[in-house]
Regions:
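Acidic Gly/Asp/Thr-rich repetitive segments characteristic of extracellular carbohydrate-active
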Residues: 4-50
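Extracellular beta-strand-rich solenoid/capping regions of secreted or surface-exposed proteins
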Residues: 40-46, 57-73, 82-100, 106-123
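Beta-strand-rich modules
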Residues: 469-488
Length: 504
């Protein structure tokens, strides 16, 4: 049997080989926009496994353009992982690409009229557990330009495509063939979640908060479509976008097999989906097309099965993904169509305080940590990353495939977006966003505004997002701050200090 890209790779892109056929390991050693050790330099040449010795935000001015035969392994980063911000990325012309656990966040200062991520030509690619946001045209599109190879045999799986920027705000235009869209979250895109043409499978996706277009049946071009649409969940949000399915403007028959698709249109904070019966357009088939088999969850179970793991979840989700997942969990009550990412409450990535973590010891510099090599029978003192193991993967692929949530550096993230809510003469209520992992709770400290002695006044349980401080003096100005704690005596950094006051 043909070797899968990684053991649970699915869909038409599942045989991409990246740099397995011969290449080199490239270490990203800094967060610079360009130059030696940068991500831009790493992707400028073909035939590379790209690993990360650093964590943080890479601020880019120009778009990143990827070469052939690359494997970008974001889960190898220490700390809180890698976020790319400032412009979009292009995989056009790049064959045989593997991208995992990366975040690409374009932003309103990016190249005008461009996607956050796009493919116009090139084949055999898989994007798994990645996050894409803030595109100025689409968030992630595969749209042929009739140059080079037709963009076919591509999988986008376990990814988040979110917050396409207004006025366009579109999830994706999918007008190619042999495209698998599997277990993704499309959120806060006004339209095109996706707009689909050609040979396509759309399985186990969640779409949340669209306005004038959710799943659009048929693209903008000529040609017939043959599509499986199975086990998806559509949840209306504040943009109140109506039915999940609508017809497209393109010419040609839209032939589809639709089964087990659900929509919750109540926008009331309760999960009450109904199975879709109105597909609006197209020619419905009674037998599914014989496309690549893939495991399926029931469409009405995706909140519990997909939402906890979707996006670039290793080593930790970033603030943007945490924010979007919280919106989905509100079940219709939260969500917005965004014009400028600078308006988000947690700030833009270039201002984030990202924990860098600790690079694992790798004596021979082959991209595989010594501890893993010793445990798995490879040589920590010899560059053996590209040696093909008995299971058909290169040694470095076996290392990458082994990385799980249990391998990340232990880290308590501080509570985000701490806000004053209300007060009485003796109480003050605060709220915050809980983007922290594995905390046992949060502790709240205050001091009078003209004093410097901080005092802990409350402790909350894990996963809490608010606290009422009691027993305060009337008519007094206070400063407040919050941090996460774990019972092992570990603490996060403090949140920024907040000014507040009791009523007289």
């Amino acid at each position: 049997a043909q070797q899968l890209t990684f053991p649970d790779a699915q869909g038409w892109g599942r045989f991409a080989t990246g740099a397995r056929q011969g290449g080199a390991v490239y270490h990203v050693t800094n967060l610079n926009d360009s130059g030696s050790g940068s991500l831009r330099d790493a992707i400028s040449q073909p035939n590379r496994f790209i690993v990360f010795d650093v964590a943080g935000v890479i601020n880019i001015k120009d778009r990143l353009v990827f070469k052939n035969n690359l494997y970008i392994a974001g889960q190898t980063a220490p700390g809180e992982g890698i976020t790319v911000y400032g412009n979009g990325v292009s995989f056009s012309g790049a064959d045989n690409i593997i991208v995992r656990h990366m975040r690409f966040r374009m932003g309103h200062k990016g190249s005008s009229g461009k996607d956050a991520a796009g493919i116009a030509n090139g084949q055999n690619m898989i994007f798994d557990h990645c996050s894409f946001s803030w595109g100025l045209d689409e968030t992630f599109s595969i749209n042929p330009d009739n140059k080079g190879k037709h963009p076919d045999y591509i999988t986008i799986s376990n990814c988040i495509m979110g917050q396409g920027l207004m006025p366009h705000s579109a999830g994706g235009l999918m007008q190619s063939d042999y495209i698998s869209l599997y277990r993704n979250l499309y959120i806060d895109n006004a339209t095109r979640n996706n707009k689909i043409k050609g040979i396509n499978q759309y399985v186990n996706n969640i779409v949340y908060n669209w306005k004038n277009g959710c799943y659009i049946m048929g693209g903008d071009s000529k040609g017939d479509s043959f599509v499986n649409i199975e086990g998806n969940l559509f949840i209306n949000g504040p943009a109140n976008g109506g039915n999940a399915f609508s017809g497209g403007a393109g010419e040609g028959a839209f032939n589809f097999y639709g089964e087990d698709n659900w929509q919750d249109s109540n926008m009331d904070g309760k999960f009450e989906p109904k199975e879709v019966t109105n597909y609006a357009a197209g020619v419905r088939q009674s037998i599914r097309y014989d496309y690549p088999e893939m495991p399926k969850w029931a469409g009405n179970t995706l909140l519990e099965n997909l939402l906890p793991i979707v996006g670039a979840s290793l080593p930790y989700r970033d603030y943007c993904d945490c924010y979007m997942v919280d919106e989905v969990n509100s079940l219709g009550k939260q969500g917005e169509l965004l014009a400028n990412e600078e308006n988000l409450p947690y700030g833009t990535p270039d201002k984030w305080r990202v924990w860098g973590g600790n690079k694992k010891i790798d004596s021979d510099g082959d991209g595989m940590p010594d501890a893993w090599e010793k445990a798995n029978g490879t040589n920590p003192n010899k560059d053996d990353a590209l040696v093909i193991a008995a299971n058909g993967y290169a040694n470095i692929e076996n290392y990458i495939n082994s990385i799980s949530v249990a391998d990340h550096d232990y880290f308590l993230r501080m509570p985000m977006c701490v806000e004053f809510v209300s007060s009485t003469s003796s109480c003050i209520k605060l709220k915050w966003r809980d983007y922290t992992y594995a905390e046992d709770g949060f502790c709240v400290e205050i001091t009078k505004k003209d004093e410097i002695l901080w005092k802990e006044v409350a402790r909350t349980a894990a996963n809490s997002t608010s606290c009422t401080i009691e027993g305060l003096e009337p008519g007094v100005a206070y400063m407040g701050r919050v941090r996460a704690f774990a019972d092992a005596g570990k603490y996060s950094e403090y949140s920024p200090e907040l000014t507040m006051a009791t009523r007289p």
